[in-house]
Amino acid sequence: MTAQSQNIVETPSRVRAHALGVNAPELAKYQDEPAQMRSGAVGKSGYLKLRFAKREHCSILAEMERRVPSLVQKALYWDEEIPELPCVTMISTSGCILQGDRLATDVHVEAGACAHVTTQSATKVHMMNANYASQIQNFIVEEGGYLEFMPDPLIPHRNSRFITDTTISIHPTATAIYSEVLMSGRKYHHADERFGFDVYSSRVAAQNLAGKELFVEKYVLEPKVESLDAVGVMQTFDAFGNVILLTPKEHHDRILARVPAHFDIKGGDCQRRDAST
């Protein structure tokens, strides 16, 4: 067994990233291996582990583990409204997500700690002629913890296939903001780029720290099978944003009161809210 294989076996999130998509019905047609380099090979099995802990005057990035092409360097404190908040930028050394990539991320916010995690720029899923790319994200937010996970938009290139699975484990007193923004593609790059990807599959689940399920949502987009411009789907819009807020009820009610539902097709703005705790 190689050193990489041993590390993968010893890291549950990496095991899941390599298995994700193998039995997914939406990816059944895309199980062929890339000719250039097999899926999940060295340089194509990325991993990030970030653990945040509370100290006297601020929270810190207490532990970090990284495997190419995933990279994090250090936490910065640039949020003037929350000066104790460590802000971490995730970087891809390959520049984009490629066919055969298997990516995993573990973020752990300890009791009373806080963290903001984002990306250096939009995440581009490169066009593919074999296989697919997969991603596992696992977040743990302990008692009184606060996590903002707000990456820049994801841009799927034409003929790309991407599957992502996210699990948020959270204490009832903690708060987590999770965001994913999906673009229609490189709209002005090529005539076939707008909704030219093959598959985008996303599953997000939340549970308490004992493993009790809070919610699960999954959507699979296959624009070559069914148009995404239909009413009730994208309806001519080019960006889809999904923001999930998990927070105690006293915060939840005040936030909902300030975020009304809104629809403006001329202005290109549609905002829906789900009033659930």
UniProtKB/Swiss-Prot annotation:
Disulfide bonds: none annotated. It is found in: Cytoplasm. GO terms for cellular component: cytoplasm. InterPro entries: UreD. It holds the Pfam family UreD. Keywords: Chaperone, Cytoplasm, Nickel insertion. GO terms for molecular function: nickel cation binding. Its main location: cytoplasm. Required for maturation of urease via the functional incorporation of the urease nickel metallocenter. Belongs to the UreD family. UreD, UreF and UreG form a complex that acts as a GTP-hydrolysis-dependent molecular chaperone, activating the urease apoprotein by helping to assemble the nickel containing metallocenter of UreC. The UreE protein probably delivers the nickel. This is Putative urease accessory protein UreD. It comes from Yersinia pestis. The gene is ureD.
